[in-house]
Regions:
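Residues located in well-ordered beta-strands
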Residues: 335-338, 403, 408, 422-424, ...
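Beta-strand-rich interaction surfaces with strong enrichment in secreted/lumenal proteins
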Residues: 12-13, 366-367, 408-412
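Hydrophobic beta-strand-centered segment that forms part of the acyl-chain substrate-binding groove
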Residues: 272-281, 308-317, 383-420, 447, ...
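Flexible glycine-rich active-site/ligand-binding loops centered on an Asp-His dyad
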Residues: 171-189, 370, 440-448, 452-460
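C-terminal regulatory domains involved in ligand/effector binding and gene-expression control
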Residues: 1-88, 93-310
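Short Pro/Gly-enriched beta-strand edge/turn motifs at strand-loop
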Residues: 5-9, 317-323, 420-421
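Active-site helix/loop of acyl-thioester processing domains in fatty-acid/polyketide metabolism
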Residues: 258-271, 339, 345, 369-394
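Non-catalytic linker/capping segments at the edges of enzyme domains
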Residues: 302-369, 396-398, 413-414, 426-428, ...
């Protein structure tokens, strides 16, 4: 699967939720491996903020990104749409300190993405695959986010609002392809009891019933409710009439929790990589979401290169006989047993290391260790299979080493190990020359890596 960006640019206009300013945000295509970036085009020097979890400077009333003096708030809805729609790279321009709130959901972003289109890029999509349970908790609030291994990406959110009118809810997104229909149009919400402190803090200047669900669930005095109505420029309401205050009816009974799930995805976008795993979030909010995103980035840095998933029960893409048809190597120099994954730019091969390998007789009799040069040779044979896969009549071609760089051996390879080779093309093959980066894994650990250049020659 390849990385994706937008086919073109689109803009959205509206009021900022907290500032009340008229704002424009423009989403633009971006190069491979650039991720999400936000540029304050209204400031001197037009600073660019990388949209990553470490750059979050506030989570009290939304996610605020910052770099130096530059700040951008209310970014989560736009980022949620990008992430859920599979966009990997995007440059975002905004002419003020926050994104426009629009209707309080992500649906307008989704509609614009569909309208402008999505473009596939050349670089492979770099998923982070969850291999073990990761959990982040906030003991003070009881919030918790857990991610578990799964072949796909899904989220379940469970919320408890400490309200008699709206108590416990849950929402689930089992397939990101359903995001536009099940999640994107869920609107942000606020309790009447929280509005006065926000107004006193000089916030929600752009808030109204067109961009939020307002929940009146604790009776207050008529005088106080009238005062809040005047401040928000809405009609007065009977103080004994509890319920939802809005221009549009609820789309789902659990719309509030669906919006919480939307926010989780927006804050997950700050991890910087698409994830394969199942998330269960209890009492989510921007603070715990950001704490989770930061922890995920730490995990990714620990395992910058992930081992491929290997299921010995699955049929190989190439068995040893097919490999023998493509490569000239024979025992004892055919060092790839099978290929389990083969794409346009990436290959994954397997070799089982046994005690009766002939090189162990001399390397070393008392402490058998696979020679590093043979590890590189095995990795290069995988690379040869990858390059040959791009050619017509691959049996008529051979590959030859030209250069090896940046070789690192990190761990001994011994009898009983199963080697997984992962080799990626660094650039398209040009004039018969290919550049590749290869890794060897034992379990989850990188045991060796190298960059190499090879020449392909038609000689049969």
């Amino acid at each position: 699967m390849k990385q994706k960006t937008l086919k073109g640019s689109f803009s959205l206009f509206g009021k900022g939720l907290h500032t009340g300013l008229n704002l424009t945000v423009t989403f633009n295509p971006a190069p491979e491996n650039s991720g999400y970036k936000i540029q304050r085009i209204d400031l001197e020097g037009q600073p660019i903020i990388d949209a990553v979890a470490e750059n979050v400077v506030d989570t009290q009333r939304g996610t605020v990104l910052g770099k130096g003096e530059a700040r951008v708030s209310t970014v989560e809805h736009g980022l949620s749409a990008l992430y859920a729609m599979g966009i990997d790279n995007c440059m975002i321009h905004v002419n003020g300190p926050e994104f426009p709130i629009l209707d309080g959901s992500a649906i307008q972003y989704v509609d614009k993405i569909k309208e402008i289109g999505i473009e596939e890029q050349n670089a492979p999509k770099d998923f982070y695959i969850i291999r073990k349970k990761i959990e982040v908790k906030d003991e003070n609030t009881g919030s918790c986010i857990t991610i578990l291994p799964d072949e796909d990406f899904s989220i379940t959110a469970m919320c408890s609002f400490e309200s008699k009118f709206i108590s416990s809810q849950f929402a689930t997104l089992d397939n990101p392809q359903n995001y536009d229909k099940e999640i994107a149009s869920a609107r942000t919400f606020v309790f009447v009891r929280d509005i006065e402190p926000l107004l006193q803090a000089n916030l929600i200047k752009g808030g109204d019933l067109d961009n939020a669900i307002v929940i009146y669930e604790r009776q207050t005095t008529q005088e106080r409710l009238d005062m809040l109505a005047d401040m928000l420029h809405v009609e007065h309401r009977d103080a004994t009439d509890l319920g939802y205050i809005q221009h549009k009816p609820l789309q789902w009974d659990n719309e509030c929790t669906r919006h919480k799930l939307l926010d989780i995805i927006g804050d997950m976008a700050l991890i910087g990589k698409p994830i394969k795993g199942r998330i269960v979030a209890t009492r989510p909010g921007h603070t715990i979401n950001n704490k989770f995103a930061r922890q995920m980035r730490k995990e990714i840095r620990k395992h910058e290169v992930q081992a491929p998933i290997y299921d010995p029960n699955e049929e190989p893409v190439m068995d040893v006989n097919r490999i023998r048809e493509l490569l000239p190597h024979r025992y004892p120099m055919q060092l790839v047993d099978k290929v389990i994954s083969l794409g346009a730019t990436t290959i994954v091969g397997v070799k089982n290391i046994t005690a009766n390998e002939p090189f162990f007789q001399g390397h070393f009799p008392q402490e058998p260790v696979m020679p590093g040069v043979l590890q590189i040779e095995a990795m290069a044979q995988c690379g040869g299979l990858l390059v040959l896969n791009t050619l017509e009549e691959p049996e008529r071609w051979s590959t030859y080493f030209m250069k090896i760089d940046d070789v690192k051996f990190r761990q001994k390879v011994v009898p009983g190990d199963t080697l997984l080779f992962k080799v990626e093309l660094l650039a398209p093959v040009r004039h018969g020359i290919s550049s590749m980066k290869g890794y060897i894994f034992v379990g989850d650990h990188v045991v060796a890596e190298a960059t190499f250049t090879a020449q392909i020659v038609k000689n049969k």
